[in-house]
């Protein structure tokens, strides 16, 4: 009988269960967990986002797997979950960023951009004939000379973090970050921490072709993706690469 009651609340995303739950939003969070992990680290002089983009098949073209995106020159996003859902939210963020520049002749703040994204996500938790977004985002950037790092949730709730993981193995990676994160670390230290966090749940080590890293530093306020050679160099330096 209890299963039948739950099934009834499953069918409508706009209906709360008697104990105050929105089952479809909870299922969307499960979809995020099925995605490969992404990590964000805020440092004294910038912010780092890193993503595991290893191919699930050797026949997949690596370049077709993209988990880190530039939103504006000072903002980047990493995703975990349904790729198509992520693309739609990234388009929303890019449009809003362009609108802000055209309307106010200045870049959008990282916080306001995040809230625009989460407001859009939230609409899909109370609209009939739609479903929640099965994706979480890390929104990283520089605002008024300060690094900012936010997480979006399928419920439409934004959270600000010093260091955070989304996607598969989130709990294990988050525990690692909580143990290893230190206030005052520089951008290079943030890159190392992000790579070590991803490696902590990968027994075979990391491959430069299967990791994306981007930084936005306070001085230049410019989004920059690390080249594959730069990632390989750091993996070798930190002894995080897989066996040949």
UniProtKB/Swiss-Prot annotation:
Entry annotated with the keyword Metal-binding: no
Subcellular location: Cytoplasm
Signal peptide segment: none
Pfam families recorded: Proteasome (PF00227), Proteasome_A_N (PF10584)
Activity: how regulated: The formation of the proteasomal ATPase PAN-20S proteasome complex, via the docking of the C-termini of PAN into the intersubunit pockets in the alpha-rings, triggers opening of the gate for substrate entry. Interconversion between the open-gate and close-gate conformations leads to a dynamic regulation of the 20S proteasome proteolysis activity.
Alphabetical keyword list: Cytoplasm, Proteasome
Transmembrane segments: none
Principal subcellular localization: cytoplasm
GO biological process, one term: ubiquitin-dependent protein catabolic process
Quaternary context: The 20S proteasome core is composed of 14 alpha and 14 beta subunits that assemble into four stacked heptameric rings, resulting in a barrel-shaped structure. The two inner rings, each composed of seven catalytic beta subunits, are sandwiched by two outer rings, each composed of seven alpha subunits. The catalytic chamber with the active sites is on the inside of the barrel. Has a gated structure, the ends of the cylinder being occluded by the N-termini of the alpha-subunits. Is capped at one or both ends by the proteasome regulatory ATPase, PAN.
Function recorded in the entry: Component of the proteasome core, a large protease complex with broad specificity involved in protein degradation.
Protein name: Proteasome subunit alpha 2
Species whose genome carries this gene: Haloarcula marismortui (strain ATCC 43049 / DSM 3752 / JCM 8966 / VKM B-1809) (Halobacterium marismortui)
